[in-house]
Amino acid sequence: MKSTEHNSFRNEALETISRIGTENSNLFELKWFLETALLRFDEIYLNKMQPRLLVIGNDIPAEILYAVCDHPFYVLGGSLGTAHWADELTPRDTDPFSRSSLGWLINPEFNITENALIVIAVSSDSRRKLISVLQSAGRQVAAMDIPPMNNTSNAMHYYKDQMVTLAEKIGKHTHKHLTGGNLRRAVRKVARAHRQWQRFTSTAYTAKGFITDEAILLVTQCLYFADSLDEWMLHTAALTEELEVLNKRFMLTQKEQPNVLILGSPVVFPNFKVPQLIASAGMRIAAVDDSLSLEAALSITRGSRMISADRILDKIAQEHLQATSSGARVNNEGLYSYFLHLVRQLHPDGVVCHILKGQIEYDFELPYIEKAAEELDIPVFRLETDYQYQDMEQLRIRMEAFGEMLNQRNIVKRKVKRSA
């Protein structure tokens, strides 16, 4: 493959980082996040990394991963460059996330798999294809199955057994085993990170004059990019405090803009097409309902010191099984329930349902979302795309029409309110 392909891999990240840095130049604490994200696209850094554990997606409970590995390396897709590297390795119907993730693991420019065990949750057909390709290429892979039901005791026990079996396999590779002490420490650490995520997003979404939507997404996703979860928490706390100070010192007059809720396929750095389109259409993101934000919303605590590790595992299995979205499942209640929670809390003007081509599990949920939104008088815009940028102009026209419709609705609402 040509070296220009690697340049496009890094250039995509550079372009996004440059845009976010320019638009948020007033935020001193943001610099660490920009540097952290860009490191993920540094060939020298990647060749030096040699992680022991590679995690595809965020379907596997973080509490389990941190109990048996100090520094899991997450692969979340998001890159058009890595997707191109995997074009010849995957069937045409493979979704962009899976193709991009495979490109991170098999490519001619860097190798992060040499000493690594790759773990993956089998939540879709594309994931099954990934496992086959990786094993054929000689990579070490351990898979965790997702049961087709999520509301039965048998499903929970099966899921718990899958977690424990996977943790034991990882522990043999990392030499850090699943003990009660390690599990409690991991639960405490992940809970702190999730609280910090929630505190930051709550502050950032009320400080829209000081930080852009793309910057908010980048900061939260650096939880998965940072070498150290503790370091991410430290810098996120500092940025949150900076935003709180700015909010108190300055009163910015903000233009009336429609607030939209994004749900569906995760929007992952560096491919920030969706927030770009939303901003260009004169709208703002009120919140995000995807697997990343849903994971951060889970509240799992270790309980009292007397609670057994087995009870903690039960709680982890129960919470994550209900939250996980799977194309093999009849109903995915996690995204729907979180959607209703966010709507009640934030009262968004509209919903943008982002679906990556091939991720049919989100299309399965769309009728339920649309029905609930219709009852609440909230318009829904379905946006299906991939990591390519050729459709930007077409999507921009459609998004601007959606934004204008929301604007007109808000104008009518304000007139009715004034005349009441």
Language model features with spans:
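A charged, amphipathic alpha-helical module
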Residues: 2-52, 168-300, 310, 328
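An N-terminal, globular interaction/scaffold subdomain
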Residues: 51-109, 116-117, 123, 130-131, ...
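Gly/Ser/Thr-rich loops at beta-strand to alpha-helix junctions
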Residues: 55-63, 121-128, 264-270, 357-364
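Redox- and metal-dependent alpha/beta enzyme cores, enriched for Fe-S-associated oxidoreductases
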Residues: 56-78, 85-86, 261, 265-331, ...
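Acidic/His-rich segments in extracytoplasmic proteins that coordinate ligands and/or metal ions
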Residues: 102-172
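A short, acidic, amphipathic alpha-helical segment used as a generic capping/interface helix at domain edges
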Residues: 104-105, 330-347, 364-365
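Proline-aspartate-enriched helix->loop->beta-strand connector
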Residues: 115, 343-352
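Peripheral docking tails and interdomain loops at the edges
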Residues: 367-420
